[in-house]
Amino acid sequence: MKRHLFLITFLIQTSVFAQVTVSYQLIQTYSVENINSLITEMGLPSGIIVPEYGVDFYRVLYTTEYKDSLVVVSGAMVVPKNMTCPAPLTSYMHGTTSKKLNVPSYNSSEKDICILFASEGNVVLAPDHVGLGASTINLHPYMHGWTEAHAAINLMRAAREIIPEDENIDVELSDQIFLFGYSQGGTTTCHTAKVIEELYSDEFTVTAIAPLSGAYNLSGAQTDFINSGQPYATPGYLPYIIMGYQSIYPELYENLSDIFIEPYASMFPNLFYGHNYNMGYINNQC
């Protein structure tokens, strides 16, 4: 019944202002005992995470900006159960992945991070991003800050739409917002904070961010190293960036052979567009 009311509310309110939620689904419930077992399996030191709450794990489909249109993407929403005080909204940005379903709302280790943080009393959100997860876009625009930031921001909007309307979600959101991420997620964390500050400060007030091990100076330190002639341990990241940016800015080049020599120009479409290979495999092919 509540789901029907949510859909009716959604249809009414779309005539007033744009909603971003398309649908959402409860994937799994984890008890405190389940989460403690997960901590043991992960080999985490005692006391790093102390679960206080069981959690419900949802997959959310929502709309986000991609180039000059809106597209449907997916993300995880993990909600603590039986909280007696308001919970902060905490957005986790995942690390680099090239496999379509190696993302938080599906079966990846990134999902476990969301579960652990939610068990300590956070509503944890984790965007899968354009081109990954449920997205039908054939390539993730890797490291494109505007696109990645909006995937995170729109998932926060979706959570604010869903949580007050679903009687099965017994948590109230506080005014606190935390952003954190690792690797690509560290960079996305910075982009998200910047976009919120510049464009959406009337809608969101970020309490704190924790960007970890991100690429923060692509046009400086990264470019200098690439041009230095030194061996690069993860060469697959370079075509991922170039091809991802070309998907946003098609004028960058017409053909991969304009940028890459053979056999790489012929190899990269299969490696990246198919979403079948992880970055370890792609790095080995480069």
Regions found by a protein language model. Name each.
Residues L212-C286:
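Accessory cap/linker subdomain of secreted extracellular hydrolases
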Residues D202-S213:
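A conserved short beta-strand
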Residues M1-V20:
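Bacterial Sec-dependent N-terminal signal peptides
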Residues Y142-D166:
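Alpha/beta-hydrolase active-site loop
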Residues G181-G185, T189:
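Gly/Ala-rich beta-loop-alpha elbow adjacent to hydrolase catalytic centers
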Residues V79-P86, A158-F180, L199-F204:
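Gly/Ser-rich "nucleophile elbow"/oxyanion-hole loop immediately N-terminal to the catalytic nucleophile
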Residues Q19-C85:
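Catalytic-loop region of hydrolases
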